Curated annotation (Swiss-Prot):
Record organism: Streptomyces griseus subsp. griseus (strain JCM 4626 / CBS 651.72 / NBRC 13350 / KCC S-0626 / ISP 5235)
Cofactor: binding comment: Binds 1 [4Fe-4S] cluster per subunit.
Domain of life of the native organism: Bacteria
Homology family: Belongs to the aconitase/IPM isomerase family. LeuC type 1 subfamily.
Molecular-function GO term, any one: 3-isopropylmalate dehydratase activity
Keywords: 4Fe-4S, Amino-acid biosynthesis, Branched-chain amino acid biosynthesis, Iron, Iron-sulfur, Leucine biosynthesis, Lyase, Metal-binding
Cofactor: [4Fe-4S] cluster
Assembly with partners or alone: Heterodimer of LeuC and LeuD.
Protein name in the entry: 3-isopropylmalate dehydratase large subunit
PROSITE patterns named in the record: ACONITASE_1, ACONITASE_2
EC number from the UniProt entry: 4.2.1.33
InterPro entries, per database record: 3-IsopropMal_deHydase_lsu (IPR004430), Acnase/IPM_dHydase_lsu_aba_1/3 (IPR015931), Acoase/IPM_deHydtase_lsu_aba (IPR001030), Aconitase_4Fe-4S_BS (IPR018136), Aconitase_4Fe-4S_dom (IPR036008), IPM_dehydratase_rel_enz (IPR050067), IPMI_cat (IPR033941)
Length: 475
């Protein structure tokens, strides 16, 4: 019987298999940041162990870093301590680190791919749930806990139970206004935030194959929001073109050999998935969330749902609590929801294509009065590219704030936060209560919807703008 993509990569990395025990997998790339690594290094220090594979380990600073005045001391003592601890640990153990101010610094899941460290057929781990991002390359990538971080640092392996596999097939053409962010939000709304629990998701079909690499990263990034262990997309010419020439990509004969292997990383025709979901791309539309989890979303053209319409009691209760927290009324048009802040950035939508798409909507327009808009590139490299293309000027001339690279408003762990009751349209990945700051209210959107929302001051798509200019950009 044939094997799925996930099964092929998994099998290639098993270094020990015993009946009744989890498989022991070799890990090809271990990414670190300041939040989940301190206790792991402490464990190594107490046991007198070194980092086993320094060549497969890399760290960056992202979660707690400020996006303004980065040359000044960090005010928050906890954030400052975590960054100082990471720097000391990396120096003590010899781990490569890209700190705040370094040209390669940025959000960990942006840095790995742009350096060519993330490659098809590899295993990638990080103490961060959105490690699934790297699955866009056909890598098996997943977030791990701090004790597992220590285990990988010490052994370069990880004992894991083999997940099931789910195929999510998206066929057809995405409508002009529909982006990868809209697609993944629609998928999560369809299968639910627990629909992928225990599975590795494989996104496939003609609509997926037509996506750029950065759009594919957006899709895989949010796999965890459906409860999945990981998300993957089979590598193809788009993948190879993205990787070729990057800092850590193979070269010469090694490149040819790598591509030959990468081309085998597809699910066999006779592979059997444990579950399958099929989606018609033509039926999709710009999508936004209205509630307090990524599965509580709807097309922008819809109204806030009535909790009474849910047959399941737990879903009905969750909807009631979400509307109460979000300050919304059942039946209210989503387009009538005003926002205070718009955030473009994060490991979901902080790459150069995302900034290009937002800039294409903002070009020649102004952010609405009373709306604060933050544009935060996912890495210093992304920022430099945006400046080279003049995107920063488009943003600032529109009235948006152009910031330094970092996780920023994706999570309330740095100075970029919502105030209680403040409402945002955000290109990030989570809309939990307090995710962007205590009492903050978050609507997840695409970069294009974020930009249009900033201009009009309420949830909107580029089609809602008063002129007929068609925004350029890459889906």
């Amino acid at each position: 019987m044939g094997r799925t993509l996930a099964e092929k990569v998994w099998d290639d990395h098993v270094v020990r298999r015993a009946e009744g025990e989890p498989d022991l997998l070799f890990i090809d790339l271990h990414l670190l940041h300041e939040v989940t690594s301190p206790q792991a290094f402490d464990g190594l220090r107490q046991a007198g162990r070194p980092v086993r594979r320094l060549d497969l380990t890399i760290a960056t600073e992202d979660h707690n870093t400020p996006t303004l005045d980065i040359d000044k001391p960090i005010a928050d003592p906890v954030s400052r301590a975590q960054l100082e601890t990471l720097r000391k640990n990396c120096a003590d153990f010899g781990v490569r680190l890209h700190p705040l101010g370094d040209v390669e610094q940025g959000v960990v899941h942006v840095v790995g791919p742009q350096l060519g460290l993330t490659q098809p057929g590899t295993t990638v781990v990080c103490g961060d749930s959105h490690t699934s991002t790297h699955g866009a390359f056909g890598a098996l990538a997943f977030g791990i806990g701090t004790s597992q971080v220590e285990h990988v640092l010490a052994t370069q392996t990880l004992p894991l139970a083999r997940p099931k596999t789910m195929a999510i097939t998206v066929e057809g053409e995405l409508p002009d206004e529909v982006t990868a962010k809209d697609l993944i939000l629609a998928i999560i709304a369809r299968i639910g935030t627990g629909g992928g629990q225990g599975y590795i998701l494989e996104y496939r079909g003609s609509a997926i194959e037509k996506l750029s690499m950065e759009a594919r990263m957006t899709i895989c990034n949010m796999s965890i929001e459906a409860g999945a262990r990981a998300g993957m997309i089979a590598p193809d010419a788009t993948t190879f073109d993205y990787l070729e020439g990057r800092d850590h990509a193979p070269r010469g004969e090694d490149w040819d050999a790598a591509v030959a292997y990468w081309k085998t990383l597809r699910s066999d025709d006779d592979a059997v998935f444990d579950a399958e979901v099929v989606i018609d791309a033509a039926e999709l539309a710009p999508f936004v969330t209205w509630g307090t989890n990524p599965g509580q979303g709807a097309p922008l053209s819809a109204n806030v749902p009535d909790p009474a319409s849910y047959e399941d009691a737990s879903e009905r209760f969750a909807a009631e609590k979400a509307l109460e927290y979000m300050g919304l009324t059942a039946g209210q048009a989503l387009r009538d929801i005003n926002v205070d802040t718009v955030f473009v950035g994060s490991c979901t939508n902080g790459r150069i294509e995302d900034l290009r798409n937002a800039a294409a909507v903002l070009d020649g327009r102004k952010v609405a009065d009373g709306v604060r808009m933050l544009i935060v590139p996912g890495s210093v490299r992304v920022a430099l590219q945006a400046v080279a293309e003049g995107l920063d000027k488009v943003f600032t001339e529109a009235g948006a704030e152009w910031r330094h690279a970092g996780c920023s408003m994706c999570l309330g762990m740095n100075p970029d936060q919502l105030a209680p009751g403040e409402r945002s349209a955000s290109t990030s990945n989570r809309n939990f209560e307090g995710r962007q700051g205590k009492g903050g209210r978050t609507h997840l959107v695409s970069p294009q919807v974020a930009a249009a929302t900033a201009v009009l001051g309420h949830l909107a798509s580029p089609a809602d703008l008063s002129d007929t200019r068609t925004p350029a950009g890459v889906r």
